Curated annotation (Swiss-Prot):
It comes from Pseudoalteromonas atlantica (strain T6c / ATCC BAA-1087). One of the primary rRNA binding proteins, it binds directly to 16S rRNA where it nucleates assembly of the head domain of the 30S subunit. Is located at the subunit interface close to the decoding center, probably blocks exit of the E-site tRNA. Belongs to the universal ribosomal protein uS7 family. This is Small ribosomal subunit protein uS7. Coiled coil: none annotated.
Amino acid sequence: MPRRRVVGQRKILPDPKFGSQLLAKFMNVVMLDGKKSTAEKIVYGALDIVADKAGKSHLEIFEDALDNIRPTVEVKSRRVGGSTYQVPVEVRPVRRNALGMRWLVDAARKRGEKSMAQRLAAEMLDAAENKGSAVKKREDVHRMAEANKAFAHYRW
């Protein structure tokens, strides 16, 4: 943590095709080795596949999928008197988005489809229907928080 001042958030330019800041942020999560144009191709390709299969607009499905993945609570380790407790804490909105996007991309990378665009599209469709490994990850995190609810008074 900085001692002098809090560092401000950087402005992210909205993506060129849909004008969405959320989608631009998502492309940055998908990007590897600074290859932004490749990340754009993957994301736009996935959104086209999703729109064809689901029959809804590109952004609508993306936001539905992300809504079903975003966690509301998570656990953080807190050391109290020699023992470590998993303390449930509420997730801030910015972190909520970041975790949801990261889990979506991680789940897509572990899938078996041929191209990354197909994997991402399949994971988005699953997430929009409350299925898939990204949604499972969110449920696991919520289950951990629920199991450790007794330690909620150790919040800081």
